[in-house]
């Protein structure tokens, strides 16, 4: 019998218990041994629940129990999760976590400790919820040079942008609806300002590069400045606006960014709607591949965590995960990265077109009949630095959105 402890009995923690209890027979068959939850760590009591007699308030009880072979961290946040996870690994216990903040900040260190102790630190659920992406990158696709990962990694913002596109609603209205449905927190900044997606792409970037990609080094822009009029231009061009998190190889560097982008119908991420997530992966041998599914939610995320528990249980005395170095990878300078840009500008297109072309070079003009006193245009491919230099000469610019190739 393999005994585990679950740290945290919130949404994901209760989901982990539910998955194990519901699918216990098939889980045990896949492990080849019975799995038992011995402890659930939480500050609260849960009378009348399946974990009523498993609750402990003392982490040291778990740490000092040699019967506990796997610790499941689903508390969230950095502390005390980091301390508990590190102590568990140093004590020879494998860890499965869904904590993206923990993995993004301390993943390199925790993976190294696990490797030194011939145990595992597993984190499939930290990116994409129930979408399997970590294990494919660390096992199935290890024969490939991964050239690009671009994803819709936050369900809240994808839901909001989908509503704005399909219903013509403005940002504030769809945010309130997302909060009412439980998709967005009372303080939605982690989602709408792009921080959640940033941590996730930092983890994926670290995996494919083998070095630490610091989330604080990734240029991050959320959707708070996306207005209903931006959506009207997108529709006029036959495109959609998506919050994309991407990392692309540029020589020996990575170009990593989180930002709203205009996406053409031919792009695999164009059709991803509502709260769903999707991750586009391009390998030099694989070609293009897509991973799609529920990127959050109690049971999809818990399912991914339990998948890691099963892997840890099957490999109790063997470290099976690849790691990344603690040495930071230098990212491509934002000013050097190249793409097309969509620009909204106050004024009359006929009056300003010549000046725009003289500064920006060839552009494709875009006009929306119902929007008076402004127009839009799409530039040719240019560097971010060049765009900024050109844009500085036009105080009439209302907004800019990058165009995903």
Language-model segment annotations:
Residues 309-405:
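A conserved regulatory-domain signal marking ACT and ACT-like small-molecule sensing domains
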Residues 1-90:
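N-terminal glycine-/serine-/threonine-rich beta1-alpha1-beta2 phosphate-ribose binding loop
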Residues 55-56, 96-98, 121-125, 148-151, ...:
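General beta-strand structural signal in soluble alpha/beta enzymes
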Residues 81-87, 91, 98-137:
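Rossmann-fold NAD(P)-binding glycine/threonine-rich loop
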Residues 68, 115-196, 203:
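Rossmann-like NAD(P)H-binding beta-loop-alpha module
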Residues 268-323, 330-338:
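ATP-dependent carboxylate/acyl-activation modules
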Residues 175-271, 276-278:
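Substrate-binding/catalytic subdomain of NAD(P)-dependent oxidoreductase enzymes
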Residues 260-284, 298, 359-371, 381:
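Low-complexity, glycine/alanine/valine/leucine- and proline-rich hydrophobic stretches
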């Amino acid at each position: 019998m393999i005994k585990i402890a679950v740290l945290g009995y919130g949404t994901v923690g209760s989901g982990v218990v539910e998955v194990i209890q519901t699918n216990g027979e098939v889980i045990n068959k896949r492990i080849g041994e019975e799995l038992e939850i011995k402890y659930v760590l939480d500050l609260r009591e849960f009378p009348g629940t399946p974990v009523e007699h498993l609750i402990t308030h003392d982490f040291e009880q778990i740490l000092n129990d040699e019967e506990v072979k796997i610790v499941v961290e689903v508390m969230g946040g950095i502390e005390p999760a980091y301390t508990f996870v590190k102590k568990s690994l140093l004590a020879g216990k494998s860890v499965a976590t869904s904590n993206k903040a923990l993995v993004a900040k301390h993943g390199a260190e925790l993976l190294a400790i696990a490797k030194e102790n011939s145990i595992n630190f597993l984190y499939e659920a930290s990116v994409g919820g129930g979408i399997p992406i970590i294990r494919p990158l660390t096992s199935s696709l290890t024969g490939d040079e991964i050239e690009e990962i671009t994803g819709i990694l936050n369900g809240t913002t994808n839901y909001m942008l989908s509503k704005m596109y399909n219903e013509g609603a403005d940002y504030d209205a769809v945010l309130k609806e997302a909060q009412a449905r439980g998709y967005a927190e009372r303080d939605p900044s982690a989602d709408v300002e792009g921080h959640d997606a940033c941590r996730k792409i930092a983890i994926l970037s670290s995996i494919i590069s083998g070095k630490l990609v610091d989330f604080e080094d990734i240029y991050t822009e959320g959707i708070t400045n996306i207005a209903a009029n931006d959506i009207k231009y997108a529709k006029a061009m036959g495109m959609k606006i998506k919050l994309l998190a991407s990392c692309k190889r540029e020589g020996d560097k990575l170009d990593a960014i989180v930002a709203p982008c205009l996406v053409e119908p031919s792009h695999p991420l164009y059709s991803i709607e509502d709260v769903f997530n999707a991750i586009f992966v391009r390998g030099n041998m694989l070609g293009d591949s897509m991973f799609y599914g529920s990127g959050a939610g109690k049971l999809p995320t818990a399912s991914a965590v339990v998948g890691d528990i099963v892997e840890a249980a099957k490999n109790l005395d063997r470290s099976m995960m690849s790691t990344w170095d603690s040495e930071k990878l230098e990212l491509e300078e934002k000013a050097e990265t190249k793409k097309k840009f969509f620009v909204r500008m106050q004024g009359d297109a006929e009056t300003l077109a010549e000046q725009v072309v003289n500064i920006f070079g060839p552009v494709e003009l875009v006009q929306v009949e119902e929007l008076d006193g402004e127009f839009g245009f799409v530039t040719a491919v240019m560097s971010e630095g060049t765009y900024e230099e050109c844009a500085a000469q036009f105080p009439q610019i209302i907004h800019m959105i990058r165009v995903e190739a």
